[in-house]
């Protein structure tokens, strides 16, 4: 929390009618670019114009190495601010603290217990501080052992709080999230689960700005899959995926599903720009990034490919269209891996 509040050592000035920006960043000891030469971090959407080091101005070239304490002046395209900040200033993994500090697991039947272990793994391997379990009172038919003892056996030494309901409604989940600091809602996806349930959870996620993980017990997360989009904000699915990959030492696979050539438009140039930004983020986080290009129906192809992933991270991005919402709903139901939905 203190890290999130720490003021960034960044000065910014827009020019060219807001189409460009000049920023000055002080390089910290944990910056991803510290010790790197400019030729290693070059990009088409920003340029390093000058360094101020030990009271001297340095006009940099490809072999100039960035050092701790440097004041770096960067000129960048509009919209690239957060990406450049992440690249140069460095950001310790902090997900899901941007959304909330606790994990909420919803258990509606005994079958959901297999997903409880995944929530324990998730809590331990993110910056979440505690685990809350919203469960039915009659979760077990036989009642041979107490619910508390069963949870303790599954969650090992992970601390948790139990909250009981006779029957868990969507309204109960929404109320719990609004009254607590929840960073992720964990919900088990079962075969035959209704689309309306998925839709309701996504609506809660968007309304409360709380990620929801549709759990399918595909942990540990060694490979994370994402759909390429052009949203690189601090709490975007792209940023969250890289945050998780860095903290879990996981690889990332970015999937671009294009329309047939005769239907393609200027979107192809946006995809190229997004790919370049993803490659820059992979370089700064030292994460293996694989790119997959496919053609056809985005939702179906990504769902089919998800057997290669342990976790899929998706969102509607900046495109809040009917089609993008349907894509998210389809993937949440049909993905072979657990799906983390990030609200936009």
Regions found by a protein language model. Give the residues of each.
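Flexible, Lys/Arg-rich cytosolic regulatory linkers and terminal tails that connect or flank
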Residues: 1-31, 215
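Cytosolic Rossmann-like ligand/nucleotide-binding regulatory domains
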Residues: 28-81
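Small/aliphatic-rich secondary-structure junction motif
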Residues: 92-145, 149, 225-268, 279-287, ...
């Amino acid at each position: 929390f203190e890290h999130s509040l720490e003021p960034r050592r960044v000065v910014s000035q827009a020019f060219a009618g807001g189409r460009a920006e000049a920023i000055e960043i002080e390089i910290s000891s944990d910056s991803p670019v510290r010790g790197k030469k400019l030729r290693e971090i070059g990009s088409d959407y920003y340029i390093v114009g000058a360094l101020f080091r030990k009271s001297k101005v340095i006009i940099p070239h490809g072999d100039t190495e960035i050092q701790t304490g440097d004041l770096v002046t960067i000129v960048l395209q509009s919209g690239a601010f957060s990406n450049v900040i992440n690249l140069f200033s460095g950001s310790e993994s902090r997900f899901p603290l941007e959304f909330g500090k606790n994990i909420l697991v919803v258990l509606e039947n005994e079958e959901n217990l297999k997903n409880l272990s995944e929530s324990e793994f998730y809590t331990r391997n993110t910056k979440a501080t505690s685990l809350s379990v919203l469960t039915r009172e009659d979760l077990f038919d036989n009642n041979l052992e107490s619910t508390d003892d069963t949870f303790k056996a599954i969650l090992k030494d992970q601390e948790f709080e139990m909250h009981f309901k006779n029957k868990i409604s969507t309204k109960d989940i929404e109320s719990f999230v609004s009254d607590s600091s929840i960073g992720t809602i964990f919900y088990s996806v079962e075969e035959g689960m209704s689309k309306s349930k998925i839709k309701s959870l996504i609506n809660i996620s968007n309304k409360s700005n709380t990620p929801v993980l549709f759990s399918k017990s595909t942990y540990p997360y060694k490979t994370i899959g994402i759909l390429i989009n052009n949203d690189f904000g601090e709490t975007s699915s792209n940023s969250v995926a890289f945050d998780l990959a860095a903290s879990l030492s996981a690889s990332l696979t970015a999937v671009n599903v294009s329309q047939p050539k005769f239907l393609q438009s200027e979107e192809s140039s946006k995809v190229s720009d997004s790919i370049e930004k993803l490659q820059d983020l992979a370089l700064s986080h030292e994460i293996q990034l694989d790119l997959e290009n496919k053609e056809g129906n985005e939702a179906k192809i990504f769902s089919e490919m998800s057997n290669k992933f342990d976790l899929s991270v998706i969102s509607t991005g900046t495109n809040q269209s009917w089609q993008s919402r349907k894509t998210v709903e389809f993937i949440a139901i049909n993905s072979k891996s657990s799906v983390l939905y990030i609200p936009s």
